[in-house]
Amino acid sequence: MAHISVIRASLMRTVALAIALVACAQASVASTTCEDLGKFPLAGGNITLAARVAPNDTIPMKPLNTGMPATVGFCRVAVTLTPTSDSTILAELWLPDAEKWNGKFLGVGNGGFGGAVPVGDMRGAVAKGYATAGDDLGHQLTSLVVEGTWVIGHPEKLKDFAYRADHVTAEFAKTLIAAYYGHAQQRAYFRGCSNGGHEALMEAQKYPADYDGIVAGAPANSFTHISAGFMWNEIALNETPQSQIPQSKLAAIQKAALAQCDALDGVKDGIINDPASCHFDPSALLCKSADGPECLTKPQLTALRKIYSGPVNAKTGKKIYPGFPAGDEALAHNWDLWIIGPQSFQALFANQVFGSFLFNDPHWDFRTFDLARDSMRADQEIGPLLNSNDPDLSAFAARGGKLILFQGWADAAITPFGTIQYYRDIQRKMGNNEAQQFVRLFMAPGMMHCSGGPGPDNFDAVAAVDQWRQKNEAPESLLASKYAVSAAALTGAPPGEPLITRPLCAYPRVAHWTGSGSSDKAENYVCR
């Protein structure tokens, strides 16, 4: 019996030692306090702020003179990163409390040309338990005006914008995560839409070790080709004074497209489920006599056809980039915001890309643009920096990386056909079997640019890529919901009950209504 007592005593000492070690480990998890992070030595930059943010504290939003309330408490760290002498990258890292942290890091991308830390998306990420970081891509906006003159005379800032800012932000974030929590993150993910999608794919291609999983929405990855498409549309609508399509005529165009294609999926609901199968011919809209709100003049019809077809090199006959699908022309803040009108966003962005990025001329006139000449020059001179359309993702895939692409079919900013083209390029380059091991594309019917529109636009692609990376369970569909307020996913506001749910099927499959049950419920659809 004595030897049993000795064993029992030894066992008790072992258990006590284990408990002590666990206690020490727990005590060291946050051994670096939030305030102490302000003194942390940072290579290639300096920390400008390290402070606690309490729930309901106001988070400033630049360049707007406003803010939004924090939904949870966290440690806010702001830094200035200077990888070169001409670099000024403002970035932030938000660290949830140790007991709230899910053990993962989420980098978030920007929209437009960046110019401000994407605090809206970071707010949603930290509320879900992620340590999250974002940056301004190396330049600072002072207003909401679309301008790119900050790059003139600053080639290093163009590199920061194109790819470097997100990479050095990921490096600094991981360093401080380990210091704050006492250990590194379990997984690192990145999510971005629009230019953020461009950033996401640049990370996968140029820095495949930065992230374990990436979500790229509506990616502006073929940057120079997309810009050429923007310019093509601007020129088409300004070919003659009569070429402009007024906003008042968009309803007639959409009505005609829906009449031809809405019912193809078995449900007539104002949403074309698969616009790729819609071969809309707008010729019936040609005015028979006098101009009117329900018809198009010949110059307007010519311009519309060019928007649908996409830019073509007149010298070679080769298509430079795809055009836009039909059926969503009259949606608010869609074609009216992005395509038509002298101050459309497409025109504003294209004029800056070619005027500032390519020609370094703040007074450049778009009427001097030659598509064949200038698009080729853009591809040669700035394309190698800006384009993240390389389909060879073998280094990312070899690390076990997972990629989810998504796009709204009603997107009037980045053509959905361009994202499909990139997905097919990956399949061709890497082989379909290999591509299926790490990449999926989800098309969202009725969703506009990144969110909004009549279709379900709220879905958690980050959770899907996390599940895929952690458990090797590839997503074959995403559950998408439509709420009364589309911004609910961004703001973190309680969305209430969804108005519509639908499955987003892994491309090329499309959701089809079974013919029974409510067409507003996802369970009544199948992917095929």
Question: Which stretches of residues belong to each language-model region?
Answer:
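Cap/lid segment of the alpha/beta-hydrolase catalytic domain
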Residues: 102, 111-185, 228-229, 236-239, ...
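Alpha/beta-hydrolase fold nucleophile elbow
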Residues: 183-194
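Glycine-rich nucleophile elbow surrounding the catalytic serine of serine-hydrolase chemistry
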Residues: 116, 192-202
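Histidine-bearing beta->alpha loop at or near hydrolase active sites
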Residues: 438-452, 466, 484-486
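Catalytic-loop region of hydrolases
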Residues: 28-104, 119-120, 267-272, 281-364, ...
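Bacterial N-terminal signal peptides
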Residues: 13-26
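Short beta-strand/loop motif that positions the catalytic acidic residue
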Residues: 405-407
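A catalytic-pocket lid/entrance helix-loop region that shapes and gates access to the active site
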Residues: 158, 202-204, 209-312, 443
